[in-house]
């Protein structure tokens, strides 16, 4: 195996974010994508306390009794956002396949803003843009997860600017494409 494929390149985003080396960072990302197709990022500006708070409160939520967690299950099986108990969901179901469920319990959330009005004319979009079910009673899962989600949104926007710079197009080229993501 070629030596260059034995490790993934780690790229520091900090010089892009602070403006000291935007072209150099973009070039590193382009090279990683061309040569390997994957990369690791650091210097992404997501605070460790934001990650730790979300992890801690998530563990607290998943340790709750099943009856309390079930209060945050979506009202219809086809909706994703909210809590899903162990072995109640599976990727195969979305593909129309009959197979055993995934052996996991999950909590799923989407964008904080309500984008549904932009997609009312698409019946399938109602499921993707259903409101978040954010626990705040037994455990305030909402606040730390919203903080983390917003950090991920900011990181996504930064990465798309890096990609745009690497492709030699305007830094905002991809921005409008993620305004109403789900």
Regions found by a protein language model. Give the residues of each.
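Peripheral, non-catalytic segments flanking oxidoreductase cores
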Residues: 1-182
